A protein has these predicted regions:
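Flexible, glycine-/basic-rich loop-and-beta segments that form/coincide
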Residues: 103-148
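A short glycine-rich, Lys/Arg-flanked "PGG" loop and its adjoining helix->strand segment in the class I
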Residues: 35-52
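Conserved S-adenosyl-L-methionine
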Residues: 92-103
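A solvent-exposed beta-alpha-beta segment
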Residues: 2, 6-12, 157-229
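Hydrophobic adenine-recognition pocket in adenosine-nucleotide-binding enzymes
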Residues: 27
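A short, well-structured juxtamembrane/interface segment
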Residues: 145-162
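A conserved beta-strand element that flanks and buttresses the S-adenosyl-L-methionine
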Residues: 20-23
Length: 229
């Protein structure tokens, strides 16, 4: 349980426990003090241990237009160049990195202590870093313009089919980002269906749309489903 995990790590200072491998998936962009976090990782790692982490990758967010990643939980948005500076500052080195399409575009990074036995995959790492150098201020302006177009397209669709029955599919965090950015409310969408029974009869924040079960959605027979997952 969460309580036992906290209890375990609170006690870790009482003995010299080191780890061969530490994983941090979908967490690094939630951390308010990444330097302190990396310092703790360094202290917990064995001299030849590795740290594997995966986080939403800013350049792919720009490319794939996954603006629904931008929410209150994600306090930072990293490229490899920025992460490399943070890890180096805390005596860690990147030994491998690869991109994937998880959550609309992520990067998996493997780190080790600077003085460890591991060699860096310089060709792979430098390829990613060189590609990042192509990102300019204009890249963000284009990102902004494309987001605005999506908002316009969705608004036009909802207006065009205002007399039809439209139900949202998935009461997710990302979906709520889209709903609120596009100013969609219960005037535009009748309901949102979800598989999680704990969400039933609750309402989406900001947009105030009632959440129902998938079974009820099927009974209602909507004309359109707006996918929000």
């Amino acid at each position: 349980s969460k309580k036992n995990i906290f209890k375990f790590f609170k006690k870790k200072g009482k003995f010299n426990l080191k780890f061969d491998m530490i994983s941090s998936f979908a967490i690094f962009y939630d951390i308010e003090n990444p330097n302190r976090f990396c310092e703790d990782i360094y202290n917990l790692l064995d001299e030849n241990g590795i740290w594997i982490l995966e986080f939403s990758y800013l350049p792919l967010m720009l490319k794939n237009l996954t603006f629904d990643q931008i929410c209150h939980e994600h306090v930072t948005y990293y490229g490899l160049k920025t992460f490399k500076k943070i890890s180096k500052k805390n005596n860690l080195k990147i030994i491998d990195a690869k991109l994937n399409e998880i959550n609309g575009g992520s990067i998996e990074v493997t780190c080790a202590k600077i003085d460890s036995k591991f060699k860096e995959s310089k060709n792979k790492i430098n390829k990613i870093l060189n590609d990042e150098n192509k990102i300019t201020e204009n890249s963000f302006k284009k990102f902004n313009s494309r987001i605005k177009k999506i908002k316009k397209d969705i608004s036009q669709f909802l207006k065009k089919y205002k007399q039809k029955k439209i139900i949202g599919y998935g009461a997710s965090t990302k979906g709520n980002v889209v709903l609120n950015y596009c100013s969609i409310s219960n005037k535009d969408i009748s309901y949102i269906c979800d598989a999680n029974k704990f969400k039933f009869n609750k309402y989406t924040p900001g947009s105030n749309i009632k959440i129902i079960s998938k079974n009820k959605m099927r009974v209602l027979k909507p004309d359109f489903l707006l996918v929000l997952i």
